[in-house]
Amino acid sequence: MIKGLIAPILTPFDNNLNVDQSMYNDLAKSLMDNGCSGLAPFGTTGEALSVGNKERMNAIEGLVKSGIDPNKLIPGTGLCNLPDTIEITKHAIDLKCQGVMTLPPFYFKGMSDTGLYNYFEKLIEGVDDNKLKIYLYHIPQVCGVGLSIDLVQKLKSSFPETIVGIKDSSGVWENTEAWLKIKDLIVYPG
């Protein structure tokens, strides 16, 4: 677990709209040198859905090669389709990232808790690695799909070593407060 400030790092692009790896590495190092305890690349602020899988994986790998401790990284890996989410998540594990921050599938709205549970279950089965640590990403005002308290409790109960936490960006204190009551669930509000 990373304690302290985890910065949702911006993703800089060059004039050809490719990730500017040098600037990305410099930004990451500056954030870590100036008091951040960890980084969350490719979250909402990091333009996650503007970058393809290969470029995203290369950028995270570039951070590690530049000297950023992978145990200080929680990259965003959630996408609408399961195979791409599995691929990016496996890559983060291979790099020894501390965990992954995963959105629910968000293209179809109004998905039931059962459907969302099945998605995360298939993700965990597809990755098939006991080193997998998932931080669920709850930001319904952006992705249009929320995670209910009951769903998070069920996922934590079913996969206690894998579902380790939640990033709650909903801004709804009642959600944060309820998640704080779930045993052994790490809650990152904001």
Please annotate each region the language model reported:
Residues 126-130, 139-190:
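Catalytic alpha/beta core domains of metabolic enzymes, predominantly
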